């Protein structure tokens, strides 16, 4: 018997008990690091009820059995898509892109012209507006960027949004947040909105990646954007994430985080605040974790 009455749908008599919610919350946190407090129970119920119905399951207990099973990997991804909201736009938190344009990118691109390797990472890229904004900023400073060793990695835990991001097709409303010169130079107008141009596409590699899992990247990053992602994690998970980022950054590299996020834990000692939610790796670069042969093969 549960401590509180189960949340239920009168039309179908499908209820979600406190025990069901606890199982779902554990699955989401174990798999994706996302913390679901009790206050989110109604939201979880309303969003996952659609999945229970679509699968023809009798109740949430059966749904929990599915997502907890080895055969439920695909449904765990569907569950994540149902529970997360991908709200973003081009050049969100413009001050970060101003910092890139004015201070961070000029020395990096100068080095790239001389043969240096430059790597940027949009971690939790959602539907792609962030990495494309990075590409536009790079191209505005170095139009021939694709001829140099400059690459942007864009990852998200949700394969469905990665597919949308890779497609690079956006609605007319998305035009409003792109500076006019960049809009004309780096996008193509379509009847319903815009298409990302080839110059920006050439700089970006999209890939699904769970930040709670292994990171099969080699080499160090010069810039990491991970904004409005860590807010879904509990404090210990956030601290581990900041430390892992620091371990993949070059000395002097920058980490940009969301407006409601703060660096805490061991990474505080090596990440110096240099602006609004902007941090620079100070001192010597942390040693990189050991990599497998397969990991070393991924650029």
Residue ranges and their predicted role:
Residues 2-121:
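Conserved AdoMet
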Residues 100, 224, 249:
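Residue-level signal for inorganic ion chemistry
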Residues 252-259:
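Conserved beta-strand signature within the Rossmann-like core of class I S-adenosyl-L-methionine
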Residues 264-299:
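Core SAM-dependent methyltransferase catalytic element
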């Amino acid at each position: 018997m549960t401590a509180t009455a189960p949340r239920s749908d009168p039309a179908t008599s499908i209820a979600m008990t406190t025990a069901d919610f606890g199982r779902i919350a554990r699955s989401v946190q174990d798999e994706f690091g996302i913390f679901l407090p009790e206050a989110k129970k109604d939201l979880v119920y309303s969003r996952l009820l659609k999945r229970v119905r679509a699968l023809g399951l009798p109740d949430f207990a059966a749904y929990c059995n599915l997502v907890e099973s080895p055969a439920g990997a695909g449904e765990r991804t569907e569950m994540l898509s149902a529970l997360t909201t991908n709200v973003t736009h081009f050049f969100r938190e413009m001050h970060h892109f101003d910092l890139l344009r004015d201070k961070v990118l000029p020395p990096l691109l100068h080095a790239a012209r001389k043969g240096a390797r430059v790597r940027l990472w949009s971690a939790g890229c959602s539907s792609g507006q962030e990495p494309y904004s990075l590409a536009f900023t790079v191209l505005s400073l170095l139009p021939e960027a694709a001829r140099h060793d400059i690459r942007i990695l864009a990852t998200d835990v949700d394969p469905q949004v990665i597919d949308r991001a890779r497609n690079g097709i956006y609605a007319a409303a998305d035009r409003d947040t792109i500076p006019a010169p960049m809009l004309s130079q780096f996008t193509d107008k379509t009847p319903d909105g815009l298409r990302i141009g080839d110059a920006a596409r050439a700089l970006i590699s999209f890939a699904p990646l769970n930040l709670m899992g292994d990171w099969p990247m080699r080499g160090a990053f010069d810039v990491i954007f991970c904004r409005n992602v860590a807010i879904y994690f509990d404090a210990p998970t956030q601290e581990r994430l900041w430390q892992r980022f620091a371990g993949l950054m070059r000395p002097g590299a920058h980490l940009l985080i969301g407006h409601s996020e703060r660096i805490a834990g061991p990474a505080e000692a090596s990440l110096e605040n240099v602006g609004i939610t902007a941090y620079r790796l100070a001192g010597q670069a942390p040693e990189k974790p050991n990599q497998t042969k397969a990991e070393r093969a991924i650029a």
